[in-house]
Amino acid sequence: MASKVTDAIVWYQKKEFLSVATTAPGPQQVLPGYCQCSLKDQGLFIQCLIGAYDQQIWEKSVEQREIKFIKLGLRNKPKKTAHVKPDLIDVDLVRGSAFAKAKPESPWTSLTRKGIVRVVFFPFFFRWWLQVTSKVIFFWLLVLYLLQVAAIVLFCSTSSPHSIPLTEVIGPIWLMLLLGTVHCQIVSTRTPKPPLSTGGKRRRKLRKAAHLEVHREGDGSSTTDNTQEGAVQNHGTSTSHSVGTVFRDLWHAAFFLSGSKKAKNSIDKSTETDNGYVSLDGKKTVKSGEDGIQNHEPQCETIRPEETAWNTGTLRNGPSKDTQRTITNVSDEVSSEEGPETGYSLRRHVDRTSEGVLRNRKSHHYKKHYPNEDAPKSGTSCSSRCSSSRQDSESARPESETEDVLWEDLLHCAECHSSCTSETDVENHQINPCVKKEYRDDPFHQSHLPWLHSSHPGLEKISAIVWEGNDCKKADMSVLEISGMIMNRVNSHIPGIGYQIFGNAVSLILGLTPFVFRLSQATDLEQLTAHSASELYVIAFGSNEDVIVLSMVIISFVVRVSLVWIFFFLLCVAERTYKQRLLFAKLFGHLTSARRARKSEVPHFRLKKVQNIKMWLSLRSYLKRRGPQRSVDVIVSSAFLLTISVVFICCAQLLHVHEIFLDCHYNWELVIWCISLTLFLLRFVTLGSETSKKYSNTSILLTEQINLYLKMEKKPNKKEELTLVNNVLKLATKLLKELDSPFRLYGLTMNPLLYNITQVVILSAVSGVISDLLGFNLKLWKIKS
């Protein structure tokens, strides 16, 4: 065997491709042709080695042909222009994966490590925290961090005897690490990369990159956006800072930086707005865009919405020198304060303005020399009309109205694209290569929304019934208009504050738990009334005259209440999101019911045509993906894992020392955590199960099939058409049953095997505790099954 391996390695180093042999595989024919890997990957090499013994002559012949095809590629293949059929649907559309959400590029292990490091060394990562949070929240977290450090120092430095347990002081540290990890995973989709260099060299390099890209685009070259990023990332290494420099920069950033929402404009992806909904145009509002370029220097030149010159007239009359000067100044200011990623995002916005200037100037040049050609003119007017209408709709709207931004942008872009496609199809490709860049970057021209890219994008309409008071009217409505009305109804719903009040109460209870624990350990309930107020004060705070102990207790109380409140506030946000998902599902189910549609003030239509079924499936998948998805799932999964850990520790403590279980301070807190988290998880499971049940309700399709048979009876002449629709409804019912899955909490429960293992472990632990307390053997997992 050793000789075979040696010969295989020699053969592997000398031979490039495997030749077809007619004899049995020998020592020098052990590697298959598809494994052209380096010797560094030992696992793959051994896989190739042992796989060679399974091969036959036909497989080697096939591999030889595959290698030949790989060498030639598609260059010699005859190719014709083809187009994807936009009027057909894919299984991704029905499943919902066609409406993709932003995902982090790093694995969860790396994000967890980064979150822990950024919490432990909080002051040294102040720029990152300023970019992913607001300035007020950053100062609040900084104060809590310093107070926690002070509490640990006071606990270690005190010499007088006291009754303060160590868990009371270090307990908030674990919660701080958990919150930091959760926040790092939430913002991981558009967290700016750390700057690789500082100082004037970076500013000069960014300024040079900005000028270079503007001149290249003016010459018509197809430079990508990675030019600036590569210029920044290839420059030098990060310089080391002393502790004094860090705190001096922290003090400087505290009073001069506006770090409210810088990170949300750093990467050119679909941004997630304040209420959690995705804005597909790549930017939230004009206000958030301006926040990203604010600077403390008074002579900084920024670009306001009215100065950005989106309309055609301003683009035609704007001087190129002023445009390049503004681009240079903005790039300089951004690079000096926000790092390369944020400056890169802003320069993309500015470069597109310059791109429009150069494109219109080139259009004017073509029109001067070729007055009979209308293609450049139509292309320029189309892009200008689309961008100016979108800019006008955003400039006169507050930042909070994100849903109107979404739907108006969708409709504006759809109308502009449908009105200009027939005029500027070939000419724009030949004359304006910059338009191709905008076409590629435009999220409306990507493949995430296939039902928007038909011959009339976003304008495929179905006949729907709407109510105006007591009058019943019929109107042709598109998917965007129907979903917009559903969105308006969901946004107008007033959420309850019951769980928020419950979270506030739990925060206060967990903060007062150490005081109650010391009182219960010092005196009995009968003797509690016999003590004076001063004696109870001394017992609750653990000391009478020691200022260090009193300060430590007060600091621990403030930090504990604040961190617990933040965690339960995030759970309340997740509960509100789950409630909105349930409202989406309810209103979607009301579309095909006349009585419920009138009561809910949403349109009503029947699935009497194949086109209606297609729109119904598209609308169903789209509404399922609306709102926050991954960010809320991170919060829920963290609560789920925390609950499992708390329940496991409580069960272990009860099995080990159940007689003195309440004699430990941390056991009191674990019981309160277990009860409160269980209530929230039950709420999440209830809302999620109801939402899945609403979307998986096939009774709607069965009812529509009955309606088709009733219509066949009244109109026998349309029997063939109605039979076709009935068959499509049957196929849709089978497809939904195959694709839909029951609701499960995000995290480990998504894997059925791990879900069952976790379920058995928890139920086994609880069964052991109950059996030990009651005196007889009880197996809960058998009862549940």
Curated annotation (Swiss-Prot):
Cross-referenced InterPro entries: PHTF1/2, PHTF1/2_N
Sorted UniProt keywords: Glycoprotein, Membrane, Transmembrane, Transmembrane helix
PHTF domain boundaries: 46-191
S-S pairs: none
GO cellular component: endoplasmic reticulum; membrane
Compositional bias annotation for Polar residues: 220-239, 309-333
Basic residues composition-biased segments: 200-209, 359-369
Pfam families per the UniProt record, alphabetical: PHTF1-2_N
Subcellular localization: Membrane
Residue spans of biased composition, Basic and acidic residues class: 210-219, 391-400
Entry annotated with the keyword Glycoprotein: yes
Glycan-modified residues: 329, 697, 756
Primary location group: membrane
Protein's membrane topology: Multi-pass membrane protein
Membrane spanning residue stretches: 136-156, 164-184, 497-517, 553-573, 634-654, 668-688, 760-780
Residue numbers spanned by region Disordered: 190-239, 304-401
Keyword Membrane: yes
Biased composition (Low complexity): 378-390
Alphabetized PANTHER family for the sequence: PROTEIN PHTF2, PUTATIVE HOMEODOMAIN TRANSCRIPTION FACTOR PHTF
Protein name: Protein PHTF2
